[in-house]
Amino acid sequence: MRLNIFYILLIALCGLYGCKNHQQPIIKENLNILPTIYPEYQGALLPVNIAPLNFKIQDEGDEWMIQIQGKGNPITITAHDAVEIPIKRWRQLLHQNQGGSLSITVSSRKKGEWYQYSPFTLDVSTDSIDSHLAYRLIEPTYANWNSMAICQRELSSFKETEIISNKKSGQNCINCHTFNQGNPNEMVMHMRKINAGTILIQGGACQKLNTKTPHTISNFVYPDWHPSGKQIAFSTNLTQMSFYDAHPKIIEVYDTQSDIVLYDISKNEVYTSPLLANANKLENFPFFSPDGKQLYFCTCDRIDSLPQQFSNIKYRICSIGFDPQNNQFSKQVDTLIDLTNAGKSVTLPSISPDGQFIACSAAPHGCFSSWIPESDLYLYNTKTKKLIAATEWNSPEAESCTTWSSNSRWVIFSSRREDGIYNRLYIAHIDSVGNLSKPFLLPQRDPTYNQRNLKAYNLPRLIKGKVTISPITIGRCAEAKGKKSVRFSKHSYKPLINEATENHSEIN
């Protein structure tokens, strides 16, 4: 009996501390070069709670041995194809090495002989990242789609679940999902074309809104929640597309009209200002300061001769004061970020929760920089008033949408850097003085998944927990015949609308 207990304890300890019969190979030669791996994770800085960085070795070899070392018990893995790191032991190793680094050594067996590559490092931050990430998965097309879904991913694992699929909402278009300060229980999104309406989710309840009024250009489009959760700012847009017949670029997307409005949730009323709904301007992409006292937005002069002169459309980022108690805006607009003299248009802004940095996308023209290869990310420091290019994050292809972690230390952004077609998601660190880390591709259980996946990632949004309302509940809400119509407040400025129609484009 004592002998049996001894063996049971031995087996348990081996499972706990990773005892495996990995016989250390006799190395014939040290190659003194780094292994070629995909994704290219070497030198990345990791959140302490990120999923394993599984990778594929692209060099020639019959068998691989990988050793991951740091404080605590090392991980040794043998592989013939993709390298899959045990998730429990990975989490333990990250926890033990936060603020330090891991060393990864790869050895290759070729024709019975072993060769060892130079080790590469992964740095482990003490900063964690929010637990979940929401995004839309859609074919990288311009106007048509077969299926799309808004999904959520647990970032400490590979678990992906559906928030809503258009299979449950009438095969329609679903877009512009946004959360209140990363709260998974407060969410807004739009249904387009079939079962059209805005879906508002609060505390497990779901309601459908008709947001077209006689004083709005269109239904609500790009949203941002006020930090109080009582109001949501929206743009209203008429968006068009033009295609090239002989040009390296494929498409140009632009607004012919756009305004910004404020929706008061409890009052079911809409407000705006002549400074946010100017017929001679295009206003777009509203977002609030963390204290809720400023509304930032993108704006440029309206041009009638489109698409002929879309190269002259260059947006700036401005701000206007906001009184949340009375839903009133100030009488002055201030310009924060202006790159028009440098020949650039600045759009797709987001602000860190601590209010220190504004991330934005700069391109030669327009407001839909996701399809402009020259589009790069910039960072504006609200304390120093300095704007810098996020050189460490940029690539020759388009970088566009950004989302911030709740501790303001991590940014996830979309990039087409791998093939110029599919938007994929990259994670990068920023410290309190603006130092940037190398971005790394969102980890997948199968490291080749992104090379095989035929869906693009659209509009990443970090959230502090899992969205728990069921896809069936959202789908039923979307397909409901009745919807509550919003109304313009009698106390608000009411713009005159010459043309009002729904958008006909779907851009990702």
Where are these regions (language model features)?
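Bacterial Sec-dependent N-terminal signal peptides
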Residues: 1-26, 508
